[in-house]
Design a protein with these regions (language model features):
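Hydrophobic/aromatic-enriched cytosolic interaction surfaces used to assemble or bind macromolecules
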Residues: 1-352
Length: 352
């Protein structure tokens, strides 16, 4: 959805998902039967290099990007990247219906009432949700120019050319739209649980109708385990991932359950806000993505708490995966949803 207007089109874009715990690279080849995976690489990001979407250590992040690119074997330089976090504002607004040629100016005027930054300090984009009764409902997206410059700078430092800047939550929607082209006319909440940020995107009939980032994620689980068991953060993270580091799963359960309750409450607040803006529309299903989505028991717990189906994202459902990448895709699966959504982008493809 989000586009920087001054980059030019290229036919060989790849997805570069820059997270606070890992960098993920995905590239497809186009085909009449659908995209096929040609490159996949993941590299870890050290703690505190990226925090809640803010880059704290650009040189270290650039090295992680280079490592992921090397593991993927990507030969092109043109990347589609995503942003998330505190300097990203996503608002659902309503304005009187205006002619198409006047819409961007009208959105800018309305955005000034909803964005806590000076309008000349942000890149602004929008998506029309609906038109009815002489009014237009839109999702307005603003991200501080300084944040985009920060991300573009570190990507360029890694030797790449960022040609698309999207929003992580909307990239999540890109892959869902590809993999579920016959989505029923019900609201589906996509939730990507990253290390420090949860990205939510509510979709209906192939379009985003609500989106929000929540500063909560897998690091909350790691911190709770560290405090509960009095063990180092590195050991707690490994135990959370199911690695054999001398900690039984039963020992983790009290800490995990506490954080899962907190996660549920955070998301419920977002759902309540969505309901207040959506004319009593209700969410019919939840799809979890991100590295923390595969935490044993989490989907079942959330389903029982909210009383609606919860399932894991299948970002490669309609993508041809060669045998060489099958094991990595099976292992990472939902964690690659944003990278897949970014890999589907091309400059100019989302212009209104």
């Amino acid at each position: 959805m989000f586009n920087i207007p001054f980059f030019q089109r290229t036919p060989e874009t790849f997805g570069l998902d820059i997270g606070s715990s890992a960098v993920k690279v995905v590239q497809f080849r186009p085909a009449a039967s659908g995209p096929g995976l040609v490159a996949l690489g993941i590299a870890p990001v050290a703690p505190d290099v990226v925090a809640e979407g803010t880059i704290k250590d650009p040189p270290s992040l650039a090295e992680a990007i280079k490592q992921a690119i090397g593991r993927a074997g990507v030969k092109t330089k043109e990347a589609a990247i995503g942003v998330s976090g505190r300097e990203l504002i996503i608002k659902k607004v309503q304005i009187p219906e205006v002619p198409a040629k006047e819409l961007r100016d009208a959105v800018q005027l309305e955005a000034e009432h909803h964005i806590p930054f000076a309008i000349d300090e942000v890149f602004l984009d929008y998506h029309v949700v609906s038109r009815r009764d002489g009014a237009m409902e839109l999702i307005v997206v603003a991200v501080k120019k300084s944040k985009v410059v920060e991300y573009v700078g570190v990507v360029e430092e890694a030797g790449l050319n960022p040609v698309v800047v999207d929003v992580d939550g909307f990239a999540l929607g890109n892959q869902f739209e590809l993999n579920h082209p016959d989505q029923a006319d019900e609201a589906v909440a996509l939730i990507d649980i990253g290390a420090s940020v949860m990205k939510t995107n509510v979709m209906r009939a192939g379009a985003s109708i609500f989106a929000r980032d929540i500063p909560f994620g897998g690091n909350n689980y790691t911190q709770a385990i560290t405090q509960h068991l009095k063990i180092p953060a590195e050991q707690a993270e490994a135990a959370k991932l199911g690695q054999d580091v001398g900690v039984t799963w039963d020992a983790l359960v009290p800490a995990l359950e506490t954080v899962s309750r907190e996660l549920s409450l955070e998301v419920q607040r977002t759902f309540d806000y969505f309901a207040s803006t959506a004319d009593s529309e209700r969410i019919g299903k939840i799809v979890l993505a991100g590295g923390c989505s595969q935490l044993p028991g989490l989907a079942d717990y959330l389903s029982s708490t909210w009383g609606i189906p919860v399932e894991l994202a299948r970002p490669f459902e309609r993508i041809e995966v060669p045998p060489a990448h099958a094991e990595a895709v099976a292992a990472a699966g939902p964690a690659l949803a944003v990278a897949v959504g970014l890999a589907l982008r091309q400059p100019g493809d989302k212009a209104e």
